[in-house]
Amino acid sequence: MAEELKIVDNRSREDANLSPVNKIEIYSFFDPFNTDCFKLSAIISKLRIEYNQYIRIRHILNPSLKVLTKCQAQSTSDFDNIALAYKAAELQGRLRAERFIHLMQNEIIPKKDIITEEMICDCIINAGLDYNEFKEDLQKSKLTESLKIDLHIAREMEIEQAPSLVFFSEDVHEEGLKVEGLYPYHIYTYIINELMGTPIEKNLPPKIEHYIQKKQLVTTEELLTIYEWPEKLMTKELKKLALQQKVEKLQYPEGDFWQSKMPRI
């Protein structure tokens, strides 16, 4: 564990203007174009399912020069710049903004699609955001200031790569633990249990069809992470859902994906 964890000064969290809560705070720094960040989203989903009452997660688009340069290179204007789009989406709620970025990653990771204004529009609407309000917020200069705040947080926590997770206990005097890169699920649960210091009762995941219906597009690897089933059993269940016309199998260079054919929830 010593090689996987780094200590983070808790002053970083104080600078983030977040009041302490009776939960473990997790800062998730991500790069929307990074495959490992896309894979980590499955682990974060599982953490939310099992430990929802014990954790609070804040997603921060890693505002490094490298990431922001990629965002700028993929855009022709502010309307198709994913970094600014994410900050504008956050103004309508962080959970909806996370939903938006997940839908965007569904487009740009497996399909290798170029970001367009139309793609962003579709993902904004499908994430349950008000598109007209989103367009108005995109034109506000405070989005750039918001990115600068994120950059300050990242520098204070010495974030050097994405994905990176930083864990803080409810004790503001305790230092945080930083995990850089992608690791097996048990590494993250070990940290949560250590920080809680008391026995934790985990929640069970929803029915697999309900999970796919909510996420809309998932990988086989993600489902194996969430449910921890033998691969043969997972394949059998997915084939059954496909026969029931509830899901459709899609094949991309990044692997097999399963797309929901059920109404969005």
Curated annotation (Swiss-Prot):
Give yes or no: UniProt keyword Cytoplasm: yes
**Where, subcellularly, is it found?**
Cytoplasm
The UniProt transmembrane annotation reads: none
Instruction: Give Gene Ontology CC terms.
Output: cytoplasm
**HAMAP family listed in its UniProt record:** Adapter_SpxH
Q: How does it assemble?
A: Interacts with Spx.
Q: What does this protein do?
A: Adapter protein required for efficient degradation of Spx by ClpXP under non-stress conditions. Interaction with Spx stabilizes Spx and exposes the C-terminus of Spx for recognition and proteolysis by ClpXP.
Q: Which family does it belong to?
A: Belongs to the SpxH family.
Protein's name according to its UniProt entry: ClpXP adapter protein SpxH
State which gene encodes it: spxH
